[in-house]
Design a protein with these regions (language model features):
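Conserved RNA-binding domains used in RNP assembly and mRNA/RNA metabolism
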Residues: 1-90
Length: 90
């Protein structure tokens, strides 16, 4: 992935992130025309997530945050929320 200008357009993408102990719903900022897979491969050690809802693995809400960082090495699954068939994931 090439280095992008700070002036380049980004889009908020709602994602679901699963770690060993947490389920996180929130937004990440992707540059236009960049796939989520490419973003994750090229990302720094932490992924910025906005408007985050953090739940335990059983679905119990732990907290909400306007911003948090997720350590990339702890991500087991990440998927755009609009690709989930189950409407409860959105």
């Amino acid at each position: 992935m090439e280095v992008k200008s700070l002036n380049e357009q980004t889009d908020k993408t709602k994602v679901i992130i699963l770690t060993a102990n947490h389920r996180i719903k929130g937004n990440i900022s992707l540059y236009s025309n960049v796939r989520l897979t490419d973003y994750i491969v090229e990302a720094r050690p932490f992924i910025a997530v906005t408007d985050a809802e953090v739940m335990d693995i059983n679905g119990n809400l732990i907290f909400n945050a306007s911003f948090l960082n997720v350590q990339k090495d702890h991500i087991e699954i990440i998927v755009p929320a609009d690709m989930i068939a189950d409407n409860t994931a959105r």
